[in-house]
Amino acid sequence: VGGSSLYPDAVNKGDQTVEKKGAGRARRPDKKRPGGDADVFTALHKRLNSVSRLDQRHLARRIKGIRKTTQADLQAKAISELETKIDKAEKQLARRIAAIPVCTYPPELPITQRRQELLETIRNNQVVVIAGETGSGKSTQLPKICLDAGLGRKGIIGHTQPRRIAARSVGARIAEELDQQIGGAVGYSVRFDNKTNDKTSIKVMTDGILLAELAHDPDLLAYDVIIVDEAHERTLNIDFLLGYLHRLLPRRPDLHVVVTSATIDTAKIAAHFEGAPIIEVSGRNFPVDIRYRPRDAEGETLDVPAAVRRSIGELTREGPGDILVFSSGEREINEICEAVRRHEPDFEVLPLYARLSSKEQQRVFGESKRRRIVVSTNVAETSLTVPGVRYVIDVGEARMSRFSQRTKVQRLPIEPISQASANQRSGRCGRLGPGIAIRLFEEEDFDARPEFTEPEIQRTNLASVILTMANQRLGSPLEFPFIDPPDPRAVTDGVRLLHELRAVRSPAVPEAGNAGRDWLTDTGRSIARLPIDPRLGRIVLAGDEEGCLFEAIIIAASLAVQDPRERPREKQKAADEAHAPFVDDRSDVLTLLHLWHLASGKRRSLNRRQFTKWCRDRFLHAQRMSEWFDTIEQLRSAVEEMGLANTYSSDFDVSLGSGSADPSNWGDDIHRAVLAGMLSQVGMRVGRSHEYLGPRNARFAIQPGSTAFETKPDWIMAA
């Protein structure tokens, strides 16, 4: 099936590619070629059995093109060049297969005891669902089991993770167990950091990286196996990937899919893939004593850092062992860490969240002579295993991406976690022996919480998904095989936003079969090629129209990452003074341009350590600054591929002090470009108050760190 759809002139029978009868009328034998042209092309097709599946597609298409060549001399030259390419492809596949290491398995992991059963089930089924408790070893051992099942030859083993930190950690662990250098037979790929090469057989990556590859490899021919790890997280990427694989598998019968989950209803996933077999693998969990210590007990309400310190005192009296604290976000984690360091000097206190540098993240997994307290987001729930943990303190909250149906704004509020998440958190202290988990909320509160976390697809803005699906001719989200369908209202809102951005031709949700590339405008197709949110992509394109493309890229990139400017609660005045040199009173947008200009110069002239110190002294987050600069370069590469002119605003250098001009004209083109992506986020001041009235009667205020906080203009545009 796969062969006939991919190679029009060939049928795939097992590992053999043979000519279809009547496929491509053979020309008369060329007397200068012993055996004639038909024999030559048959031999070329046979050689495709010894190249990778992805190379097979490209080379088979090339063979078809050469067969249509009527001039003998041109055909002979093309065949010679093709034979050279096949030679290269054969050697490349041979090198990768030769580099596959001998797999060994840690005997203490529960999954090792089920290795043979898993191997046979994966080999004999196209889809397998594995319900593996945290600590079972599923993330690190499944890729090796796939290798031992004979997979990972014609294509590689792709292993997706929902977070960059987990992709790096899992990849490094697999490489270590196989005694390999990361980036060889085992590699990882995350945004701005690719550690793979042509010998890589196991590729651990974020699900976003795999989805991005669909643009140039829609049939995922580069892969023999796709392992979708941590499916219980039900992120938008995971749900989209599972739906895409559901559609892909009938035309890729040689592709294997393994879906792993810790808490999700695995029967639902198995049913999604037409009754795929389910294998349950237990973890290494000991009994956990769960204690409820609400923050408002005993007639007083403690803030979170104080409640955490109280619980640390209780656990310290229980005996030795490291403590893992779950909090909601980066700022909350840093507040807890600072409070604990002040009052618990004997502990080594370490934060853990996705935006930490790789070096800082690795500190959590290294050895320490002191007792540790690790304060983490939900990244340590299932994605990562923090070693040495005997105790857990759970704040019971997490930041959840949520789209407001009323204001049409995507928010990141702090919300109570589900029962499944709370149980995952408490289970992290039962891997080495009996553990204790303290929950900083009431037991009645726990009982009232939902059993599972609501899938992201049911609580997020779908404009980006709708745009991607239309660009890849996947139809309407309402007809796509998602495990849980999106809210029709969210689909309508997403389509209306795309119409506002001039990305689609109609504000109405398209009927079946009409949500394809023809529904997109030229602007929509261009936005779809940019690796950012559609609103930000529209800003970039408007920057090109306004003659300030590079400034628009800088601004869009800054809005795509977390704001690098820090304003700690206890040091707000000092932070404001440090930020003053790059503040532009006219707008936060122009302030960002000043910051980029100042920081980019320092980044070129200072080494990494010096630049980090320069950022810290100015209340700038060095890691976020680096991510901002990396995103700028990624967008510059994208617009160059699109053939856009790398234009600069004529006022840009002037506004930075290199000349003189009418200040009233500075930045108008830049502001117009930003407005193109933020049309529905304009606000009018309500009387002389601090409030602004936006679309759909949404009311909001300017945050104190904004340059507009003091001036309070009559109209503002909020990004």
Segment roles from a protein language model:
Residues 3-539:
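P-loop NTPase motor module signature
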Residues 345-346, 351, 393, 401, ...:
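Second RecA-like catalytic domain
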